């Protein structure tokens, strides 16, 4: 890929300006999200821990989606607040986000400091791969959060923060048990 891949789609200076503006808007959104996340993780470190996958992440993910797709051998796991598939996606997003930020900084520095061509070429290639990976991740995120029928009941909770009790019992049994036990301890 690299820079040549994207340049092949641009034939006029107006198209180049549009491409740079789109990149600027995307970079601003990406950086806002990155710094928002960093601030959130610093202010509430426990939230970061609940996003990390556990040792059963792969088998839990396979069972979760196997049960959703109706495979009889798949047993629905005791998911907590976040599914293990979401926790694995979290690690992927952190890795790709760090890759894009690091390579973006290298690509920006090249305008101030004379860097070797192979460094800039490698940074460009990795930045482009990260971009494609993040776009595919975004599409998968929208697909699994909004488009598949099994998410339709839980999607509104991502907006208003509330979920019907029966849905919480079904979709997030481990989290539901934690909440009930905390409520019983408080009584």
Task: Kindly label every feature range from the protein language model.
Residues 1-187:
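Membrane-embedded alpha-helical bundles that constitute the cytochrome b-like, heme-associated redox core
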């Amino acid at each position: 890929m690299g820079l040549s891949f994207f340049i092949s789609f641009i034939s006029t200076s107006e198209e180049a300006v549009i491409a740079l503006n789109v990149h600027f808007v995307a970079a601003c959104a990406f950086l806002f999200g990155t710094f928002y996340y960093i601030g959130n993780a610093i202010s509430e470190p426990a939230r970061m821990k609940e996003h990390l996958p556990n040792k059963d992440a792969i088998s839990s993910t396979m069972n979760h989606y196997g049960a959703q797709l109706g495979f009889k051998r798949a047993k629905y796991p005791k998911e907590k607040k976040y599914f293990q598939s979401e926790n694995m996606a979290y690690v992927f997003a952190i890795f790709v986000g760090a890759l894009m930020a690091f390579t973006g900084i290298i690509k920006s520095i090249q305008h101030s400091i004379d860097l070797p061509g192979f460094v800039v070429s490698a940074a460009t290639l990795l930045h482009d791969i990260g971009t494609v990976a993040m776009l595919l991740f975004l599409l998968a995120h929208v697909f699994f959060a909004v488009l598949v029928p099994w998410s339709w009941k839980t999607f509104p909770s991502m907006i208003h923060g509330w979920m019907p009790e029966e849905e919480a019992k079904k979709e997030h049994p481990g989290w539901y048990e934690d909440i009930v036990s905390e409520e019983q301890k408080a009584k």
